[in-house]
């Protein structure tokens, strides 16, 4: 079960705003050895939680790619997410009311700052492997830049150094869908539910691609309505709205847009040059959201960066689905 780390001091955000207090939900697997040298930290993506054994099945667990008998695995729920960390559904201690849309905007750097505070509370001085895909890769990258001596090995999947105009446009389109749901502005916990469903359906088009749907959502030859692709989009939207919150999704997408390792560091190349970790960058050939060229850039400018490209029909979601291929590449480059 997840635990809660409570940071009682005011938590200042990159934009100058302050959270009066901060809670970070996290989970651990395995045991920390005496030398504290067996830590693997997993950073999760947009709507995931702090239990990677659930959403990265086959990669994390006993006798899996990352063996919990050998390693101490930590995963923390990010700020703004509705799985236990401080988020728009939380109570503002200064007002006694739910934050809602009064929650401050935050950045990927703020998320990384919260992870560092948690690691200090857990007395973890060094991380053997830091792993993250998509938005999780953004966090891992920032952390490796901010604390280069702390991270020994870094694995980045389907991510980038700066969120692209394409990615920002997709996120803005999803926020427009959420905002078009008039209930989004109400205080109820499930407000904006229909807007969130539409946003998820939009997002899915960038997570998959033409070939994904061509292979997985094929109709009978004479079908004239009630197409599988239509049903699938609605199903995925409803599936997310049952477990997630529209306001949290809105804020997390804004945080994703903020990602730019070069901000106030000269540029992205100079920022990436600060990373000391042995780094494996994994791209998915068919990824529309984070094209291969973005991972090629990372591998080129991270001093010890190496690039591997996975062939998959699943697009961006390949970083979650192609577990066997990922496992093989990780073991090819590292002794786990």
From Swiss-Prot:
Q: Where in the cell is it found?
A: Cytoplasm
* Reactions this protein catalyses: L-homoserine + acetyl-CoA = O-acetyl-L-homoserine + CoA
Q: Which Pfam families match?
A: Abhydrolase_1
The catalytic residues are: 134 (nucleophile), 287, 316
Query: Which residues of the sequence carry a binding annotation for substrate?
Result: 200, 317
Tell me the protein's name: Homoserine O-acetyltransferase
Q: Which UniProt keywords apply?
A: Acyltransferase, Amino-acid biosynthesis, Cytoplasm, Methionine biosynthesis, Transferase
Q: What does this protein do?
A: Transfers an acetyl group from acetyl-CoA to L-homoserine, forming acetyl-L-homoserine.
For molecular function, the Gene Ontology terms on record are: homoserine O-acetyltransferase activity
For this protein, the Enzyme Commission number is 2.3.1.31
Primary place of residence?
cytoplasm
Pathway(s) the chain acts in:
Amino-acid biosynthesis; L-methionine biosynthesis via de novo pathway; O-acetyl-L-homoserine from L-homoserine: step 1/1
- SUPFAM superfamilies, sorted: alpha/beta-Hydrolases
* Gene Ontology terms: cellular component: cytoplasm
* Source organism: Psychroflexus torquis (strain ATCC 700755 / CIP 106069 / ACAM 623)
């Amino acid at each position: 079960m997840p635990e809660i780390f409570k940071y009682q001091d005011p938590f200042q955000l990159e934009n100058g705003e302050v959270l009066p207090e901060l809670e970070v939900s996290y989970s651990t697997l395995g045991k920390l050895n005496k030398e504290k040298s067996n830590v693997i930290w997993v950073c999760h993506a947009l709507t995931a939680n702090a239990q990677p054994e659930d959403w990265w099945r086959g990669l994390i667990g006993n006798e899996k790619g990352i063996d919990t008998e050998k390693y101490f695995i930590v995963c923390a729920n990010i700020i703004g997410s509705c799985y236990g960390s401080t988020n728009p559904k939380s109570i503002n201690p200064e007002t006694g009311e739910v934050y809602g849309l009064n929650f401050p905007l935050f950045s990927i750097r703020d998320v990384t700052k919260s992870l560092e505070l948690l690691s200090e509370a857990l007395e973890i001085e060094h991380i053997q492997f830091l792993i993250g895909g998509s938005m999780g890769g953004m966090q891992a990258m920032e952390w490796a830049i901010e604390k280069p001596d702390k991270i020994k090995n870094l694995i980045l999947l389907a991510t980038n150094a700066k969120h692209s105009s394409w990615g920002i446009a997709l996120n803005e389109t999803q926020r427009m869908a959420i905002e078009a749901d008039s209930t989004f502005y109400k205080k109820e916990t499930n407000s904006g539910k229909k807007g969130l469903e539409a946003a998820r359906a939009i997002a899915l088009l960038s997570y998959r691609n033409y070939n994904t749907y061509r292979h997985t959502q094929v109709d009978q030859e004479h079908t004239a309505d009630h197409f599988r692709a239509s049903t699938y989009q609605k199903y995925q939207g409803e599936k997310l709205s049952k477990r997630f919150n529209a306001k949290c999704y809105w804020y997390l997408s804004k945080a994703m847009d903020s990602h730019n390792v070069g901000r106030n560091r000269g540029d992205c190349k100079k920022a990436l040059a600060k990373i000391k970790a042995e780094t494996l960058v994994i791209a998915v050939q068919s990824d529309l959201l984070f094209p291969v060229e973005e991972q090629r850039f990372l591998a080129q400018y991270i001093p010890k960066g190496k690039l591997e490209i996975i062939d998959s029909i699943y697009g961006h979601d390949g970083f979650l689905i192609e577990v066997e291929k990922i496992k093989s590449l990780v073991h090819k480059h590292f002794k786990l």
